[in-house]
């Protein structure tokens, strides 16, 4: 699944367009690297979101096969950010 679609389907961004812009701006990283919005995501990958409050990193446990609720999407991610 494309990174921009995954970010949107996992409810990390409201839309695929917002996700694409964040990826292009370097605010959304895949496995610690800046990649293109079309880069593939697979279970086990780490998605990092960089913002003013710091960086939040999640491990992808599974990818959605259909549209999910926000609560169901949370079940597909595991927070790995050190607190």
Regions found by a protein language model. Give the residues of each.
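A general secondary-structure boundary signal
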Residues: 4-8, 57, 79
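Glycine- and charge-enriched low-complexity intrinsically disordered segments
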Residues: 64-83
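Short, surface-exposed, polar/charged, turn-prone segments marking secondary-structure boundaries
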Residues: 13, 56-58, 75-78
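A basic, amphipathic helix-loop patch mediating RNA/tRNA/ribosome contacts
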Residues: 1-43
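S4-like RNA-binding module at protein N-termini
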Residues: 27-69
